[in-house]
Structures are given as C-alpha cells and as structure tokens.
Amino acid sequence: GQCGNQIGSKFWEVVCDEHGIDPTGRYVGNSDLQLERVNVYYNEASCGRFVPRAILMDLEPGTMDSVRTGPYGQIFRPDNFVFGQSGAGNNWAKGHYTEGAELIDSVLDVVRKEAENCDCLQGFQVCHSLGGGTGSGMGTLLISKIREEYPDRMMLTFSVFPSPKVSDTVVEPYNATLSVHQLVENADECMVLDNEALYDICFRTLKLTTPSFGDLNHLISATMSGVTCCLRFPGQLNSDLRKLAVNLIPFPRLHFFMVGFAPLTSRGSQQYRALTVPELTQQMWDSKNMMCAADPRHGRYLTASAMFRGKMSTKEVDEQMINVQNKNSSYFVEWIPNNVKSSVCDIAPRGLSMASTFIGNSTSIQEMFRRVSEQFTAMFRRKAFLHWYTGEGMDEMEFTEAESNMNDLVSEYQQYQDATADEEGEYEDEEEEEPEHGYE
C-alpha cells in the first residue's frame, strides 16, 4: 500500500547507502565488509549490478509510479512492481477479499520467483500500515498466503498503527482490528510503529517545526536498518530474525514489539558527535524514544533486545545493559531471568560513530490495542460504516471475532504484567508486602 511502499523504498535507500550501492545498482563503496554479505538483501545480476530482493505491491499505481521515478527507482526489478488500478478505498474488505484477492496470485508468482532465487531463505519482511485498505487488507492476505506456502520461514512485519490523534480515515479502527486479528495468528514478529509517536520524536527530540512523512520515514528506516544490520554485516555478536524471535517471544501470541533508535539526530544535523555507550543506552531505553504511542513505564518488559553498531567494547555494552536492568528492576518481569539480550555489529550507520536499536516486548503495548479497540466498539455498537464491508461480502461475525481476539490479546498482556514469580495464587498475598528479593 502507500505507506508500506514509501517506508520500504526509504529503507532501500538507507541499505543501498550502507552497502555502497548507487541508484543504478553498481557497487561504488570502499570496504570489503560492504560486499561480504550483500547477497542477503541483493541479487547479483549478470552484469555485476545488484538488484534488491524486494517486491512492491499496491492496488493503485500512484505510489509505485513515484517510487519508480524517485532517486532509487531504477534499481528495482521492473517485474517486481505489482499493482492494480482500482484502489482499496481504505476498505479492508476490498484489500482482503475482493480487489486484493484478484491481484494476490500475481504477487505470489513474484514471491515464488524471488524465493527460488535464495540459497537459504530465512524469511519475509513486510512493511504496511493497518489503517488503510491495501496495506491492512491485502497485506494480511499476503501474509496468510505466504504463511501457507512457507510455514517454517520467519514472517517479520513493520506495521504502522493508526495514531490516537493523527487520523486519516474514519474507519481506521475497523481496518486495524481486522488486521491485528490476522497478525496475531500469522506473523512471527511485528514491529509496532505509529505516526503520532514519530511526530512527537520529530518535534521534541529533533526540533523539527513541520515534520513531513519523509522525516517520519527517515526515522523508521533508521530502525529497520538497525534491526537488520546483523544480517547484513559481520559482527562480534550476531543475531538473525530467528534468534531474535526466540529471545523475544515468551508466548506465541505476544509478538508485538516496540522499537527505538539512538542517537536521534535530525536529517540535516547528523554531525559526528562523540557518543558513548552509556549515552546510547540511556537514550535507547527512554520512553520518549519509542516509535509507538505506548509508554513502557505503564507496563513491564517481558523481554528486550538491543543491537549496538560501531566500534565499542562488548564488555561495556553488557555492563550498561545490566545496569539498566538493576536500576529499573520493577519494569522487568522477575519470572524471566536475563531477559535482555544484546548484539553488536561492527559497522555503524553512515555519519555516526555508533548507534543502537532497541526492540522491546513490553506489556504496555496493550495501550495501543486498547485504544483501537475502544474506537472500534464505539462505531461497531452503532454498526456505523459497516455496509462498506458487508457490501464486499463480509459478515458481521468476522468483526465480532476480530474484536474479541484483540480484547483477548489485551487481557493476555495484562495477565503477564500482573503475574509474579510465585506459582499459583496461594502466596501472592504475602508476596506483595515483602520487598522484592535480590534488589536490596
């Protein structure tokens, strides 16, 4: 959809830059490290050009035309642009059942072609938004089809949730709830983003007066690049999508993560400022740094993972991370010991001496789902706008199921937020009075 293609093309600009690949696909870099694992994200064509392993899909041609005419438009394989003409009109049912269903087979053909080109396919990365029609409806359709065909491969999504204050469409709560219903069942890891949190970062931290979607996507692409840098560069402590999942997901349904990035600098002012590991760590765990509108201080971390980039001492990284956990022990569940993992990748992003990306599985993410659910219920009680969905062949039952699935998700998060280290409730009452053990 529009959002996913814009974020995705931004991500490829960043990755091309990090690997020294110019807009025509030629290598113009200066370090062997850039080429060592370039094949993870690129296919090498016969004439030595590097072609991204990327597929762009949309139900209308507009956004993809602008990607094609954009700075890196010529680098993508022309066959990998798959689009319809009709648009989904912000309607999940159109994306999932009618318009999207007509286009999905041609998308899957391209997916198969790309998958066959891989020596060892690790998984799929999907960028989409949940508020519109294409990214939410057709995006989740694609995810479920890929899940059918490649059941044992990782499915990682970067999902832009509707924001509490910034709304584009009145039916966002419907589209988002129907999508979450799908993501809970079919995705392995979801990085939750939302525009409002990104706007706040732009205003507060980056001091931008009028942030554009370009600035927001710049933030997202920095995070995406950080999440994937371990796949793309050698490092002292490597990580991949599967290791990430194993370390972050204690219960299969709870795979919605908050992400953060440090150091945050605006596009214009990425000066080479000296950074230290303690500074990075502090900024990375700061709640103002989270790219979704949920406050980690309102919940507890089940697990978290930090990816540091640049030349630094792993010992210092470990010390800082332990330090964070000891100082804020009440924000971590005590029944998962050692629940923060860190990895280090030797290559820093362009223009920075070191950087870090944060991924946290926090129970406070339920705030996002709660908010969407309240808006959903307010409209669904009155059956407002439902005819747009039933007209495409959907049943009200599906709405009810999606609503209860999302409410179940919220209560699961709440249940683990309240859980203590002790077994079944018998000791819980005495437990509350005593100070926590081990943190005195």
UniProtKB/Swiss-Prot annotation:
GO CC, one annotated term: microtubule
Residue spans crossing the bilayer: none
InterPro entries linked to this entry: Beta_tubulin, Tub_FtsZ_C, Tubulin, Tubulin/FtsZ-like_C, Tubulin/FtsZ_2-layer-sand-dom, Tubulin/FtsZ_GTPase_sf, Tubulin_C, Tubulin_CS
Region listing for Disordered, in residue ranges: 411-440
GO BP term (any one): microtubule-based process
Main localization category: cytoplasm
Gene3D superfamilies noted in UniProt: Helix hairpin bin, Tubulin/FtsZ, C-terminal domain, Tubulin/FtsZ, GTPase domain
Location in or out of the cell: Cytoplasm, Cytoskeleton
Oligomer and partners: Dimer of alpha and beta chains. A typical microtubule is a hollow water-filled tube with an outer diameter of 25 nm and an inner diameter of 15 nM. Alpha-beta heterodimers associate head-to-tail to form protofilaments running lengthwise along the microtubule wall with the beta-tubulin subunit facing the microtubule plus end conferring a structural polarity. Microtubules usually have 13 protofilaments but different protofilament numbers can be found in some organisms and specialized cells.
Protein name: Tubulin beta-3 chain
Species this protein is from: Pisum sativum
